[in-house]
Amino acid sequence: MALIGANGAGKTTTMRAISGGIHPTKGRVVLDGKEVQGLDASAIARLGLAHSPEGRKVFGPLSVEDNLLLGAYSRLPRFLGYRAKASADLDRVYDLFPKLRERSGQAAGTLSGGEQQMLAIGRALMARPKVMLLDEPSMGLAPVIVQEVFRTISRLKAEGITLLLVEQFAKSALEVADYAYVMERGRIAVEGTPAELSRNERVIAAYLG
């Protein structure tokens, strides 16, 4: 599912409200049949939701691998053997992003923008989420890296992970989504399948022209 709209439309705020970063004043957030709008972010993460935020938000001084391990923190007991219990998840992320394996001991803050985006997505995957929020995964990246990121998004979708994608490149977002919403001034203005939105004159003029 994709959420598109101009800067300031409320997309990132919506993502934060879903993931527990802020608490909505109205409405409900339902995850797997359970209302979660009053829970904090860590409790929502334990229920199976992971958030790859706008701007990546990696922990610069920590190594790539330590950043990834933090993603598993919500679901694994904190005792001796924690790293070993997460080894299969690390291998999965490294298979998706071989560059991260090469740089596993490197400080995350020294990575390129594209590598940091891979790390942010990988960190979210370490939680084994049922639902994954991706906020502007292509922001600031070179076109060739954007293509790689969207190939990964398509692969995650094929694996059965439910994805909510906020993306500045509306055309790319519609190519991977099954359904999409257009947000304007904090409200849903248009919604439909990618095929329907691609024929909508209002959407074409504002986002696809």
Where are each of the predicted segments found?
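Glycine-rich phosphate-binding loops of nucleotide-dependent enzymes
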Residues: M1-G209
